[in-house]
Amino acid sequence: MSGAVQNRRMDDIVKQAMIKWPNVPDCYGWLGLDARGRWFIRDQATQASGDFPAQKGSELRHEKLLDFVARNYESDAKGQWYFQNGPQRVYVELECTPWIWRMEPDGSIRSHTGEKVTALRCLVDEAGKVYLVTELGFGLLQSQDVGMAALQIESGLWMPESVATSDLESMFGFERSPQVRQRGAQLQQPHAQGV
C-alpha cells in the first residue's frame, strides 16, 4: 500500500507540459518534506553538505508556490513521492512519511497539503510517534498534535496499533529517499564503455 492517490487536482498546465515535453529528466534531492509538513528547497551547496533531513535547506514560504506544490504532489509506482513541476518530476526527500497530518481543535484532520481527511487506522511506534492511515494514505501526525490524539485514543475513537519505525516503508510502500535509491541504481548500472 503506497498510499498513492493519483492527484485529481493536478494543474492542467502541468498536464499539458508533460505531454509537450515527455522526456525531461527527473530531479533528485532538490526538495524535502520535514516531519512538520514544511517544504524545503535544497540547492547544490545544501546537497553537497549532506542528505536530508540533516541538511534541510531553505524553507518554502511563498503561499502561491506552496499551493502549487500541494496541488501537484503524488507518488510513482515505486512509492517515491514527487512534485510535478511542469514536465519535470522533482522527487521529494521525506524526513518521515509522505503525508503529515495536522489536527484542528475540533478533532478534524488535515494533510500538510490542506486536504481534509478521516483517520481509518492509528499506529504508534516505539518512540511514541502517532501515525494515521487515511483515505489519502499513510502519514505522521505532527508532534504538536499528539496531545489531541491522546484524547481521541482515551475516548476510544482511535484504537492504536503498535508498529516499528523500521517497518514503516515496507508496510506502507513508500521511499523516504528517492535520491539514495537513485544513487544506488546508478552504481549498479554497467558503464557503457566498460561493457
Located regions from the model:
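Short, exposed beta-strand/loop patches in secreted or surface proteins that constitute
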Residues: 32, 72-74, 99-101, 119-124
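Glycine-rich, aromatic-bearing surface loops/beta-hairpins
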Residues: 108-195
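Short, well-structured hydrophobic secondary-structure segments
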Residues: 38-42, 49-98
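Residue-level detector of beta-strand structural context in well-folded domains
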Residues: 29, 79-81, 120, 130
